[in-house]
Amino acid sequence: MLNLTLTFLVVALIAAFLGFSGIAASAAAIAKILFCIFIVCFILVWPNKTGLVPVQEYPGRSCLHL
């Protein structure tokens, strides 16, 4: 998602450099929205740094010993 944000930011900068102010404003607005969504997702995932922990059906046993 951060890649999309950076892509729209680059598009906005190029469009602004070439004089397309409407396209630059739209791309900058999209980049801003995507960045905010990215930050919210990052804050929600950050406390759980390790990600999802797999659940074992039979603790201490592997599938081969059933």
From Swiss-Prot:
<keyword id="KW-1133">Transmembrane helix</keyword>
<feature type="transmembrane region" description="Helical">
    <location>
        <begin position="4"/>
        <end position="24"/>
    </location>
</feature>
<keyword id="KW-1003">Cell membrane</keyword>
<protein>
    <recommendedName>
        <fullName>UPF0391 membrane protein AM1_5042</fullName>
    </recommendedName>
</protein>
<comment type="similarity">
    <text>Belongs to the UPF0391 family.</text>
</comment>
<keyword id="KW-0812">Transmembrane</keyword>
<feature type="transmembrane region" description="Helical">
    <location>
        <begin position="28"/>
        <end position="47"/>
    </location>
</feature>
<dbReference type="Pfam" id="PF07043">
    <property type="entry name" value="DUF1328"/>
</dbReference>
<keyword id="KW-0472">Membrane</keyword>
<dbReference type="InterPro" id="IPR009760">
    <property type="entry name" value="DUF1328"/>
</dbReference>
<dbReference type="GO" id="GO:0005886">
    <property type="term" value="C:plasma membrane"/>
</dbReference>
